[in-house]
Each structure stands twice: as C-alpha cells, then as structure tokens.
Amino acid sequence: MSIDTGSTAGPDVDTAVDPRPPRPLHQRVARPALALGAGALTALSLPPWGFWPLAIIGVMLFEVCLRTAQTRWERVRIGALFGAGWMYLGMGWMVQLTPPGYVTAGLIFSSYHAVAAGVAPAGRWGVIGRPAAHTLVEAIRLSLPFGGVPLATMGVSQVGGPLAPLASVGGVILLTWVVFQIGFVLADAQPGVWAAIRQLRDSDRTVLPNFIGRIAVALVILLSFVAPSGAATGGTLSVAVVQGGGKQGTSAL
C-alpha cells in the first residue's frame, strides 16, 4: 500500500511585502514640520516683523523639503504646509476682521502653492521650474479672485532689503521670482560660478540649471541698477487716505 506524502497546495496567498521598513515617527514628522516652519519664516519677513533675509531662508528650507520628497503627492503636501505657514501667519490680522474668511483665504492661498509644488519639475531642472511655478501662482493670487488679493506678498517682505529696487523693473512679480530663485539656487548646493564654468567646459551638464538660475538673477539685479528711476518734476500732489470700518486691532494696513 502506498501512501501519498505530498502536500496539497492550498489557495494562492500573496506573501509579498514591502521591502522598505516603515520610517520612524520622527522622520515622518520632520519634513512636514520643516515645510511649515519654512513658511512661517517667510511670513516673519513681512511687516510688522520685517526681517527680509528670512524670506530667502524660508524658501531655501522649503526647497530642502521638496528635494527630499519621493513622490508627487508628498511634494503637494509640502507645498500646502509651506503655504499654510506663510499665509496663516502673514495674514494673522485678518482673523480680527472675519475668522471664517481668514481660514478660507489661508486654505485657498495655501492650495495654490500645493498645486505649484505638484506640477513643477522634480529633476535637476526643478531649480528653474519650481521658482517659476511658485511665482506664477503668486501672480494668479494677485489677479484672482475679485481682482486679486495682494496680502502677505513676497514683494512686501523685501521693502527694507537690497532687492527692493527690482520693483522698478518688474514690479512685485519680478521681486517674487528673484526671492524664490535665489532661495532655490542656494539650496541646490552646486559649486561656485567658476567651478560650474569649468564643469560646463568639460561637458558636465548637471550644473547647467543652477548656473542658469544664478546668471538670470545676476542679470536682473544688474538691470535694476541701470533702469530709469525717474526724476523730480518740481510739482506737488495732494493725496487723501481714508480707512473705513471699526476698530481692527492693527496700527496700520
């Protein structure tokens, strides 16, 4: 008598597991927290605080978060958190006017930067594409809805800094792009200009996007020095400023 000792295969079971171990909690929290803090630093460059270098530092930290993000959805979340830190703190005075409007406006404007972070290129050309994308959504914010909402803008953050003369060349939009471009270039950690030129001579194109960003910013700044600044006409103009509404808890708007 023979006995079948072979095993009978049961139903197929998918035993595949993700080879990547789950990241520790502090690693999962660090990047979102840094993105939120980067937005807050950007807001602190605005009045009444008004320390203009914080805008560039905030953008640099924002780019550090974006460069280490592994998926598009993660970049979207980072963009939203950066925008939230920037807008909710920068427009904090609005809560005294209309709390629902404050929450809604911050949510809408944060979503602009979430979209920009999601659609901008993620490769080496991100150092050019990302500043352009975030400048574009700021241009949209200054135009839509209802003719635009020029609050907590990057241009206002630079009024007391050396980049302010750029406004005479391209207004707040150009100033916004320069701040974003400087921050993204500095966070890219590429070699100096002369080293980059040597690498380009050796057909190393990895430094090309960063090099283009540096040259573009330098050219715009040089242009601001030679751009016409106008001259006094000798005439006078009387201007009246009226602010309506009740007590708002702010010294000036």
Question: Where are the regions that the model predicts?
Answer:
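Soluble catalytic regions of membrane-associated enzymes that act on cell-envelope
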Residues: 227-253
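Membrane-embedded alpha-helical bundles of multi-pass enzymes
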Residues: 2-6, 10-230
